[in-house]
A protein has these predicted regions:
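Short beta-strand elements
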Residues: 181-200
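Short amphipathic, basic-aromatic surface patches that mediate peripheral association
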Residues: 1, 97-110
Length: 200
């Protein structure tokens, strides 16, 4: 089943002369597990994730096999500071930065690829742009497609976490979208880790 905030794993079973790709979806955290495969050699490729394309890697499966892929995310998003208001104010401001990753050798992308940022808030520790995993009235979206990537990378953005209730626990993270992901069947965001806050 197609998963939001995940990637697809393509496997080519090399025991066949003209193999049909076997496909399954990783979890949102990038881990994947498939217990329905036979031992043998496979070419394995992670694809349709928020990262630049990678070459297939040859994997020999025998019993429980662990294999890690190294990928380069489209964007690196960092929360630089969380600023809390006075006690009772229920005010929280998040400062964050967005940077492009180094484009892999042999690839060319434009100068206006960062299209959107989102400060997401939820009352549960699962926070995502998809599957109703954020509270809209507490979250903020910025359209960045009119700015150059260079100007975006030079800034520290500040967004409020809106409409909070003093003393309540929330979970926040920042997401950013690159137009490099638009050829995917579903836009893929790069995220910061989830951070727990308590509204002052």
């Amino acid at each position: 089943t197609k998963q939001a905030d995940a990637c697809r794993i393509d496997l080519m079973d090399l025991s066949y002369e003209n193999p049909t790709p076997l496909q399954f979806w990783a979890k949102a955290d990038g881990t994947f597990r498939n217990v329905a495969l036979f031992s043998g050699d496979y070419d394995v490729t992670p694809t349709e994730g928020p990262f630049f394309p990678v070459e297939a890697e040859r994997v020999h499966l025998k019993g429980v096999t662990k294999h890690d892929f190294k990928v380069t995310p489209f964007l690196k998003v960092n929360i630089e500071e969380i600023v809390y208001g006075e006690p009772g104010s229920a005010e929280v401001t998040v400062k964050y930065t967005i940077r492009r990753s180094t484009t892999p050798e042999g690839m060319t992308i434009g100068q206006k690829t960062i299209s959107e940022s989102r400060l997401l808030c939820n009352i549960y520790p699962v926070v995502s742009c998809y599957n109703s995993c954020y509270i809209e009235e507490n979250s903020t979206t910025k359209v960045l497609s009119r700015s150059t990537d260079a100007s975006i990378e030079s800034r520290v953005y500040e967004d409020p976490v809106k409409n909070l209730k003093s003393g309540q626990k929330y979970y926040i993270r920042v997401a950013a979208l690159s137009s490099c992901s638009y050829n995917s069947t579903l836009k893929r965001y790069n995220y910061t880790p989830v951070i727990e806050i308590v509204a002052p």
